[in-house]
Amino acid sequence: KEGHLTACYSDTKGNDNYNNVTKPAFAGSTMKPLSVYGLAIEDGTICWSSLYEDSAYGVVAGDNGIAREWPENVVPFTGKNVTAADALKESNNAVAVKVLKDYGVEKSVRFLEDTLGYDVDNEKKILEEEGEDRTLSNIASGYLAEGEDRILSNIALGYLENGVTVSKMADAYQVFINEGKDTPLCAVKEIEKSGETYWTPQQKESEVFSEDTAYIMNRMLREVVTDGTGISAQVTGLDVCGKTGTSEYGDHWFVGMIPGNVCAVWYKSDKDMDAETADAARICKGVFEKIGADASEQYSIPTGVKEEVYCKKSGLLAGEQCQETGIGYYKEGTFSKLCEECR
């Protein structure tokens, strides 16, 4: 929570200088809370229950020249509306792309570079060459503009071409348990000489998201663990939050959080790996169990965030007539009226 690097582990593959903790990899869906949802909640583009259709963003030409829907989801599209929170919980790729488009691709690229320090040089070149304005809406056929699926995939789906390291992902996720603030990682707390403190790290804390946004994202990521793709990270008595991620190149991730600690797990899939051993969320669970954190420690809800009951049909505050409802977290003033669709 304070930027202190407690431990790291990597297979050296027989080379003492080999360290997967500092080796870039494709982040997959672990990028979504940073490059899409956190930003969109911060500026009000979306809220917890913003509705998006569970359908493809567009059409691309496959390797065989046959058109296919893009992006692909793990499960088939339903064509029904889903909330932003449920889309993140289920790691819905199409909704992540749509939210990114609503927020702004170029703004997200700037954030990843300027605020998180990620290498997005290739993504900036794509934007310069293709232009962000070449959107699906300009193409009557429904096909994506040339290069559009590439830039959207890189940013929304975690395929930054120069990758991101495990240490940078752990560093970035601390904002979701630290009121939106980031403290640079350090492995040494202090150096003593002759019984006196000789050196301490000069860590400058910076605000990445507002406290309200950080808390709402924290609760969204809690849903991932309680009822989503990260269910195997659950630890009895602990408030575990986190996000799973995979890539088509064999990258497997889980970045998990409990009050005071972040654990980022990455591995490259091996056909000989046992499925249970290779579960990144399960590995994170084992770490949190060994930490033995205080189960009574809880996240405090900011004064600017309200827990509300919403209507799953409209995404608005639920009225007495609403039959299907859920509980979400919202910035104060998000809603000005109750659901009228269920009357």
Regions found by a protein language model. Give the residues of each.
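Short, glycine-anchored, charge-dense loop/turn motifs used at functional sites
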Residues: 1-6, 116-117
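A penicillin-recognizing enzyme superfamily signal
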Residues: 5-23, 27, 33, 163-171, ...
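Extended, hydrophobic alpha-helical segments in both membrane/secreted and soluble proteins
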Residues: 5-6, 27-41, 48, 95-96, ...
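Flexible glycine/proline-enriched surface loops and loop-helix/loop-strand junctions
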Residues: 17-22, 79-81, 89-96, 128-158, ...
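A generic secondary-structure signal for well-formed alpha-helical elements
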Residues: 43-47, 103, 107, 112-120, ...
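Conserved catalytic neighborhood of penicillin-recognizing serine enzymes
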Residues: 46-108, 136-137, 152-155, 194-223
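Surface-exposed patches in mature extracellular/periplasmic domains of secreted proteins
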Residues: 49-50, 120-134, 138, 147-150, ...
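Mid-domain, small-residue-enriched loop/turn segments at the edges of structured enzyme/sensor domains
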Residues: 65-74, 104-171
